[in-house]
Amino acid sequence: MGSAIHGDEAAFGSLPQGGGGPGGSSIQVRILPYLELGPLYNSINHGVSILDKSNVTSTDVTNSVFHCPPDPLAGSHNPSYAGCVGSGDYRNLGVLGGEKTLRLADIRDGLAATVAASEYLVGGAGVVDRLRLVYTPDDFTTGPAPASADAFAARRGDLVGEVPELGGDTQYYKGFYWALGVENITLYNHIITHNKPKGDRHT
């Protein structure tokens, strides 16, 4: 996915933007030509919403290139990879954030320390696994910093009153639909930024 993002930037002069594609399409849609999936890209009607009925045939496909084989919940429409739109407590500071257009040359602190996309575990209806849930920056702006990943998940559960929230929603959950450019589906935000202690949610 990283090499495809680089290919797209070389062709268009800017990085693909999360949710900024035609019709709200995802980064995954924009980089299809650089994953040897040009015919699929060309079959999509980019002049209308990605959810329009004219795009059902094109987007109702299984793209194994976006799936992590060991993850039993990945597959069909569910991607294992998401673009980074932000870091810390703000969602649009990432290189693929939808409020700006960036070139690789604009990343002045080095590409080696910059995340454009990441693998993550797909959620699902009724899934309560702490590694598959959706977390938001708003959940961690008050109170003591969680000391561990389990405490992090427990804090999330305490705040929403139930652990699943979007993870238990029957329609939208983490990695729900590969073609839709929406945060928590094909986009994500780093809550804990690079080189931060795991228990520190402050940025």
Annotate each predicted stretch with a short phrase.
Residues 1-203:
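Internal low-complexity, small-residue/proline-rich segments
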